[in-house]
Curated annotation (Swiss-Prot):
Keyword set, alphabetical order: FAD, Flavoprotein, NADP, Oxidoreductase
Biological source species: Cupriavidus necator (strain ATCC 17699 / DSM 428 / KCTC 22496 / NCIMB 10442 / H16 / Stanier 337) (Ralstonia eutropha)
Entry-linked InterPro entries: FAD/NAD-bd_sf (IPR036188), FAD/NAD-binding_dom (IPR023753), Fd--NADP_Rdtase_type_2 (IPR022890), Ferredoxin-NADP_redctase_2 (IPR050097)
Cofactor binding remark: Binds 1 FAD per subunit.
Annotated protein name in UniProt: Ferredoxin--NADP reductase 2
Binding site for FAD: D58, Q66, Y71, V111, F146, D311, T352
Catalytic activity as recorded in UniProt: 2 reduced [2Fe-2S]-[ferredoxin] + NADP(+) + H(+) = 2 oxidized [2Fe-2S]-[ferredoxin] + NADPH
Length: 369
């Protein structure tokens, strides 16, 4: 089956973290994981126990997927034997867990081309021109790549990354600045509360007086408004003013129909992230409502050698839980082993008792009296 994508995106960016440089000879590998979220990271672990080294691709420039993008500091309560952890802590622990297997990460790029070869392996090329020939592919891309929903004001995009931001990477960058924060969800409220008292001024704007955020955060924001520590306006941004290429004001039309001009140094917009399945939709996989259909024995797709785990897959009884994705990753690893070691019989071993697994993990085998 030909799985090529028309008009693949590629440039001459040199890849320095493994794989081939753009336009170079593809690297031959055993397993390629698409998605560096928690399930993708645990897929590295399960493959590693079977002595299968993995390469991992993610469209984001950081590891962790939506756990890190959407709720790095939010508590997670349903990871077995971990009563509470944040998205960032979960990611950090998974990275620690997979250290013995030395996975190679290729971040800030998407899979642009997948072609089935006559020998059963797959040719893969990313949007940065990194190339592989791989025996297996594991799609652990959550609900796809995340792109921020942007502010729909003509021409304002030219300030993107300069004075217009959809993510906060370095909070200190906004200290002492006049900020306008737009949005009504947790991210907008969280950053508003964090930056009040650190920024020169903070004005929060939302199109209505209702919020999709924690009630305690909303109450705290209103308390700060009463204390004159910040302002809140109901309205929508419809325009802006600039001087010498610098954003100086935004125009906000309120519920009363009056347009107000607000001075601004930086504009932070939190409209949420829009999941996009992206090129995966063109791979020839069986899809159901933008999710990939799999069997429940190996979590393999309709294309032999391509597996799907985590929120991106669907099957009867599917539950979108991190722990479900971990289970799927374990079975997918065993399902993939025959493609990688066709002559090898895979025996079930346990990390508690197997000297072989202890050696793989780099730990001492316990001595029992």
């Amino acid at each position: 089956m030909d799985l090529s994508i028309p008009n693949p995106v590629a440039d001459t960016t040199k890849q320095v973290d493994g794989g081939s440089p753009a336009g170079g000879q593809p690297q031959e590998i055993d397993a390629l994981i698409v998605g560096a979220g928690p399930v993708g990271l645990f897929q590295v672990f399960e493959l590693g126990l079977l002595e299968i080294k993995a390469h991992v691709i993610d469209s984001l420039k950081v590891v962790g997927g939506q756990c890190v993008e959407l709720y790095p500091d939010k508590p997670i309560y349903d990871i077995p034997a971990v009563p509470i952890c944040t998205g960032q802590e979960l990611t950090d622990n998974l990275l620690k867990q997979i250290e013995p297997f030395e996975p190679t990460f290729h971040l800030g790029q998407e899979v642009a081309v997948v072609e089935r070869r006559e020998d059963g392996r797959f040719f893969v090329e990313t949007s940065l021109g990194t190339r592989f020939i791989t025996k297996t592919i594991f799609i652990a891309a959550g609900v796809g790549s995340f792109q921020p929903r942007t502010l729909k004001v003509e021409g304002i995009d030219k300030f993107d990354g300069k004075q217009l931001f959809y993510r906060v990477k370095d909070p200190s960058r906004f200290h002492g600045r006049n900020l306008v924060i737009i949005g009504g969800g947790d991210s907008a409220l969280d950053w508003t509360l964090d930056l009040v008292g650190k920024a020169e001024s903070v004005v929060m704007i939302h199109r209505r007086d209702g919020f999709r955020a924690a009630p305690a955060s909303v109450a705290k924001m209103k308390e700060l408004c009463e204390q004159m520590e910040m302002q809140f306006l109901v309205g929508q941004v419809g325009g802006y003013e600039e001087k010498d290429g610098v954003l100086t004001e935004i125009k906000v039309t309120g519920a009363d129909g009056v347009t107000r001009r607000l001075p601004v140094d930086d504009l932070l917009v939190f409209f949420g992230l829009s999941p996009k399945l992206g090129p995966i939709a063109e791979w020839g996989l069986d899809l159901e409502r933008k999710q990939i259909k799999v069997d429940t024995e190996k979590f393999e797709t309709n294309i032999p050698g391509i597996f799907a785990v985590g929120d991106i897959n669907t099957y009867p009884g599917k539950k979108k839980l991190i722990l479900s994705g971990f289970h799927e990753a374990a079975l997918a690893a065993f399902g993939a082993a025959p493609y990688i070691f066709p002559e090898k019989k895979i025996h079930m071993q346990y990390t508690t008792t197997s000297p072989k697994l202890h050696k793989i993990l780099g730990v001492d085998s316990p001595v029992f009296d």
